[in-house]
Amino acid sequence: MSIIDNRKAHFDYHIEERYEAGLVLEGWEVKALRAGRGQIREGYVVIKHDEIFLIGTHISPLPEASTHITPDPVRTRKLLLHREEIKKLIGKVEQRGYTLVPLNFHYKGGRVKCDIALAKGKKLHDKRETEKKRDWEREKARIMRAGT
């Protein structure tokens, strides 16, 4: 079950490969995610020193968060992947045009996981084409319903 989805990712990028990564979170972040207080639309993934980090995601702290900590809603969060997967991703991202984007947060075995995708950015005409296809599918479904 998905906690947060990045709906714009499929519109802005051609998704080529998907990976499931663990997230290093603090306790207040897990509680906030359970309450649905997160956003990954502006998030992106970077590779630094053979480690993968999630930057730009916003997790709003709950109002009843502890007073002895100072929550940072947009802090950099480390992603956990196997070393072989990281090496493969480093090789792909170094190729021109590839990037890593977060797709969603979900639970697996009581832990919060992040689906990330190896993707290529879409050009403007690709986005328009995707929108035309979606509109045509919607219109086709409407015609089929009206016909029966």
From Swiss-Prot:
Pfam families: SmpB. Keywords: Cytoplasm, RNA-binding. Gene3D superfamilies: 2.40.280.10. It is found in: Cytoplasm. Its main location: cytoplasm. One of its GO terms (molecular function) is RNA binding. GO terms for cellular component: cytosol. The keyword RNA-binding applies. The keyword Cytoplasm applies. Residues 129-142 have a biased composition (Basic and acidic residues). Residues 129-148 are annotated as: Disordered. GO terms for biological process: trans-translation. Required for rescue of stalled ribosomes mediated by trans-translation. Binds to transfer-messenger RNA (tmRNA), required for stable association of tmRNA with ribosomes. tmRNA and SmpB together mimic tRNA shape, replacing the anticodon stem-loop with SmpB. tmRNA is encoded by the ssrA gene; the 2 termini fold to resemble tRNA(Ala) and it encodes a 'tag peptide', a short internal open reading frame. During trans-translation Ala-aminoacylated tmRNA acts like a tRNA, entering the A-site of stalled ribosomes, displacing the stalled mRNA. Belongs to the SmpB family. PANTHER family: SSRA-BINDING PROTEIN, TMRNA-BINDING COMPONENT OF TRANS-TRANSLATION TAGGING COMPLEX. This is SsrA-binding protein. It comes from Burkholderia lata (strain ATCC 17760 / DSM 23089 / LMG 22485 / NCIMB 9086 / R18194 / 383).
